[in-house]
Structure formats: structure tokens, C-alpha cells
């Protein structure tokens, strides 16, 4: 009775297997994510009519945010020194000014409408009746900005006076200038020509002008602050006596308020003035602490001002409304913005850039801008075995594996019948590229991010440990699948704190603090020796273990090749650890006079070397010089860059090069992988460009030359490998370098680049190979193993990993391994956080995204069905043949 039903069961099972097929498809971009950041915001404007925020950050960004959720709508790069923006809500234009240019931006789409070159960059932008003017003080020229609804016009005008500033009141414009030691105010007509009588101000000749804005003039004389209103320009009014510092802000409303904060007797005091009948009237005086940020809101209903101030954990609105700020370490408040209209009532920015938006007493949204200060991030290895793979492995290790497999397929069939639309392959096959990312920040926080596309909020956890340490270093201490450990150190001038965390949940496993500043920290990779990895600090030639116990360091001290490198500005030393935990200097190298160390790089200690040589077309082999003790050292000497490759065990120099005409030494970047060193710099010799130098070390200059490996690892190794070197010109400015990494090292190691064009790119190893042959015109290459040499490497579209995205401020690129040899994970940080994956040698161990799995399964099922249908016919034919024969 059951036999006629088995084809139906087989069909359902086959469909189930199709939906849960364990062959991974290369779905490019599925795991990619980007966190768009701003950094610490300097100035902010709230468009209450359209519910938008416009911000200028210290990282050099102008941005438009959605006021309802904080999402970035657009961003544009501006000069980092830009601290203020001017927004005209009527014409929808934004104006920013730096030392060289004035920019007019379209607020709707962020497109630059106009860029105006400034003469000396010492001028100032003033808001006047019907627009803005940019004035260079003590010159007779200014730029009038006429902002219309859909376009802007800039007109350079001459002025008959040596103007100091522009003011406006009652739809009239005025110019302030100085003549014969007197400050004079002169009215102007609509063409900015002198109009009407002038007014001599009651301002001393040696007075310091503090504010000349709109309709007020505030100045100081002999430690006293005075105010003048344009409508009564001949009258100076005493505002504040005895002050040291001065801060000013304007509170908009039907009745403008003027907030002045001074440091009186080392105590901050804020005064609030309004103009009544052309006179300054003091309506509020508040003594507060340095840690308080004070603001006011103009109440339209009763024409009063409500006092608002923020401390580390609270925002307090007068008279008794209190809002709690989620601030773990009670960080100081950097900025407080208050608003009387719109959905947002207050915005608080902490000193690490964290951005809080409040509506009445509710926290509406939060931006984790501390991520913009990421430093030395780490990618945890992807899960070594997915849950589906583990179940299969358990079946293979079982004596009843066949029954277990049928039982598993039967359960999958039941799940499919219950939930046919919700059952997908992801329910039985975890995403092979889902991992966690640990990001320390220079502000003292640690973040954990998830690459899981189902994780809407990428941040799994965040913990604050210290406030703004001077330096941060971090390491992946243990990358075991069950309990990965992450270590980091925060250091100040007179102390440091060392932590070990559980990378899964951020819990603190151990903590140590010392009341001195360490000279250097070292990470010891002991995986190959079946010992736990160790971290130690060095201070005054003494070793301080931060992990493990002294017995492990005693074992390290007994190993002949356990030599560590200590660098100062002018000296490089190699030392071993003695039994009494002191530095035993084995060798020392002094740089030339005037030469200073700027950086050093080493190979990734977890790097797997799959190939010990490079196979040529004729099947001969160039053997790589794979000395694990090599490190690269970069130094500067005047305008020259000096590059060394040294052996840390012997102190010998195996490669040295010098480059002239370096523009900026802080833009020298390098990576070291296997026997391959790649570094970049900007030079004006022979012409200004970005150069990439590729160096590859081999055991000999010819193929099939190989030396004894014992000679390489010896402490008396004086062998100098042969170096192939090529220089390339790159058509972009490079901001950082990285290298891809895979589990077995079989896949090509390509170079990752951060670009000043706000992109993340990758150059194939074949293009950077120093063994590319130099050919004469029309000459054919003898060895097809290498691409003929071309001095310029263009940036092609297929090299860009960030697609059409703008990834701002890329300063670090980190790569991580996956379960698939073809694929590496790529993380870029600096300002934005961008995560993607790439296959340097193509995804050869997974199906293409264009592969038609459905067609394959249907074809296979069709063949099987045809076999089942024709089987009775074949049997009948065989029976007839036997019967009639």
C-alpha cells in the first residue's frame, strides 16, 4: 500500500533539499554594511519647518540629517577648520567659509552651487538685510551674496571706507569703520553706498571688539564689557565688569536674547540680555560649573526665556524638568543646543562625539559618533563550523549515521510542510560570513559590531572604560571558537590600564593598572608552540608580564630566536628576556645623524604560507625568502625616506632603499606579507605623484636556488636575500594600506587601499609584482607568468570595493579570514565604518550568483522522474522479449 506513495515522498524530499542546499552562492554585497559618521559636531542648525538638521563636524564634514531619526541624508567634505555654518531657510542655501574659499551649498541635495576664492582668508561673513556679505577687514572690497530661491549670485563690490564689519537693523545696513582713532558707524543704501550722516561711537581707541553681529556691538575696555545697539549708536552701556574669557551666543525668537558667558574669579557666569527700547536689559544671571553647558529657549507664548543646562548625566529645564542622559562614565558635555520650535527640544553632544536628540523629556535617537575615532580594530574569525555542518559531522562520527541523516531530512520535510514560505536555506545553514568586529576608540570606548545582515542595529554592545586616553593598543589574545578574548591597554603620561575582555559579551575577565607609562607593549604569538599568547610591557629595560605567569616567560627566555625589537627615535635594538625578567640587548643599530624613525611594520603572526616558491612558466621555481623574523623600518632624513628590512634575531639589514623629495612623512604607509613588502609615499621627484614600491625577497637571483632553512633561522644568519624591486605611479592619493588574508594562504594576497577620493580599493598582486618584465616596444614577453611592466597603475572600476559609496576618512584597513579559502573580510575605519568581503582570486569554492540552481534541480528531478516512469515500460518490454523468444 505504501509503495505507490514513495515517489511523492521523494518529490517532497527533493524540493526540501533544493531549498536547503548547503552549496553557498556568492551573493556579493549581502554582508556589506556602512555606518555613516560625522565625528564631533561643532555647529548645528535646526530647520524646524522641514525637520532637518545641518551640522559641521571637527572631522571636516558638512551634513544634513533627518531630525526625526538622525539618519544621514547627505554629507560633503569641507575644511576641518570650518567651525560655523550659515543657513538661509528661505532660499535653502548653506554657506561655509574656510581660510581659502567661501562655499554655497544647496541644502536639498548637498550639491556645491558656488565656490568663491578668498584673497587672504582673514575676512568674515556677515548677515545683512536681504543676504550675506563677506568682508576682508581694512580693505575697500567685499563680496555680496545674493541668494535666490533656486540660484545664487556673488558680486564683488568696492566700498568707500576701510570697513571693520557690517551690521543691520530695521531693514537698513550699516558699516563700522575706524578713522583717526575713533569708531564710526555709517548707514548704507541698497547699493551699499554711503547714505546719510555718520555716528561716532563712544568707544575708546584701544577697545577690543568682541561681537559685531546684526544690530549689536559688544566690546571690552580695561577688563569691562560694554554693549551698543545700532539704533542708539552713540550710547555705550556697561554690561559686565571683570572677566577673563568670553563666549557669546544669540537665542532666536520674536525677541532676541543675547547670552554672554565669562569667567569671573575662575567661576563661569552666564548673563542673558534682551534689547528693550534700544537698551540692554539683564533678565538672567547664572553661576555654574565648568562641567555644565548652559543654554536658553525663547518661549513664544509669554515672551520669556527658559534656562536649560546639561551636565554629564542630566539635562535640566527650568523650573524642575529633568532628562537623564545615558552616559556611562559621566563624560563632559561638549555642546548643548536648545530649540523652542519643532519636534526636537534639545541636542547634547558629549566630548567623545556621542549625539543625543531629545523631544520634551524623551530620548528620540542617538548617534554613536565615538566610532569615528576607531583605532586598531579586530575581526573575529567566522564560526569554524556552522550548526548545519556540525550536525553533519556528528552524523559521520556516529555508527548509525545513515539513520540520523534520514531522521534529519524527515524533520526538515515536516518543517517545510508547516512553513513552506518561511523555510529557507538560512534556517539550516548559518551565514558563512557572519562575524563580530571589535573596535576600540581613542575616546576610551570599546564597541562590538555584527556583520549579520539580519542585525538591524549593528552595535551589539558598547562599554566605556576611560575618558580620552592618550594612546590605545589592542590585540586578539585568544581566537578560540568558544570563548574569544580581546586585550587592550589605555595609557596616559603617568599610568596605564590593561584589560582582557570576553569578546562575545564585553565582560571584563581581568584588569591591571600601573602608575607609570610603559615604553612599549609586545604581543607574543605562541600558538605554534601550544602555549597561550602573551602580552608584556617594557619600562626602563624591565619586562612586566601582563598575561600568564612568570613560568611562561621563562620558557620564552630559553628560546634562542625569541628576540624582540625596541625602537626609539634614533636607535633600533633587539633584546631577549632574561630569567629575571629584564631586557638582555642582543644587538643595536644606530641610525645616521639626522635620521629619525617614523614607523615599523611586521608580518601578521597568524599568516599561513601555502607556497614556498613562485613557479615560473618553464616549471622552475623562485624560492621565497620566508624568514619569519623580518620587519620593515621607515625613517626620515631631511626630505628623504629611508627604508630598511631587518632581521630581528641578528639585527642584520637584508634590504635598504632611499627615496628623495618626500612631501609628507605622515603619509607613508606599508604592508609586509610573506616575502613581500609594499609601501607608498608622495614625492615630487621627478614630479609630484603617489608612488607605490613593491619589494619581493627571494633566496637567490635565479630560479631553483635554495639555501638551507637552518641557516635562515640561525642566530648567526648573515645571508642577504636577493630583492626584486619595482616602482609604480598611482593616480590617487593613498590614505592607508592593508593586505588580504585567507585561512590557508592559497588565494592571492592583494593589497587593500584607502583613497583620498573616499573609496576602498584593491590592487591585484599580479599588478604589483616586482618581477613584471620590462619590455622594449613590440617585444614579446618570454615568460607569460607575469604581466609586462607598466609604470602607471590606473584605478579601474573593478578595483573599487566600496562600489558607488563614499567612505569618508579611511585611515585603517583590516582583513579577516572566513570559512572559504577564496574569500577575505575587509573592514575600513577612520571616520566611517565600512565592511565588505572580496575574493582576490575569484570565488572558486562557491557557486556564482548567476548559477541557476533551480534549473539544475528541476533537470535532475526530471531525469529521475523519467527513469521512474520508463522503468515499468522497460520491464514490460523485457518480459515480452522473454515470452515471445
UniProtKB/Swiss-Prot annotation:
Signal peptide: 1-22
Compartment(s) of residence: Endoplasmic reticulum membrane
Protein's membrane topology: Single-pass type I membrane protein
InterPro entries linked: EMC1, EMC1_C, Quinoprotein_ADH-like_sf
Single GO cellular component term: endoplasmic reticulum
Pfam families given in the database record: Beta-prop_EMC1_N, EMC1_C
Predominant place of localization: endoplasmic reticulum
This protein's UniProt keywords: Endoplasmic reticulum, Glycoprotein, Membrane, Signal, Transmembrane, Transmembrane helix
Bilayer-spanning residue ranges: 856-874
Residues exposed to the Lumenal side: 23-855
GO terms classed as biological process: protein insertion into ER membrane
Function: Part of the endoplasmic reticulum membrane protein complex (EMC) that enables the energy-independent insertion into endoplasmic reticulum membranes of newly synthesized membrane proteins. Preferentially accommodates proteins with transmembrane domains that are weakly hydrophobic or contain destabilizing features such as charged and aromatic residues. Involved in the cotranslational insertion of multi-pass membrane proteins in which stop-transfer membrane-anchor sequences become ER membrane spanning helices.
Binding partners and assembly: Component of the ER membrane protein complex (EMC).
Record-stated family: Belongs to the EMC1 family.
Name used for this protein in its record: ER membrane protein complex subunit 1
Lineage, opening ranks: Eukaryota, Fungi, Dikarya, Ascomycota, Taphrinomycotina
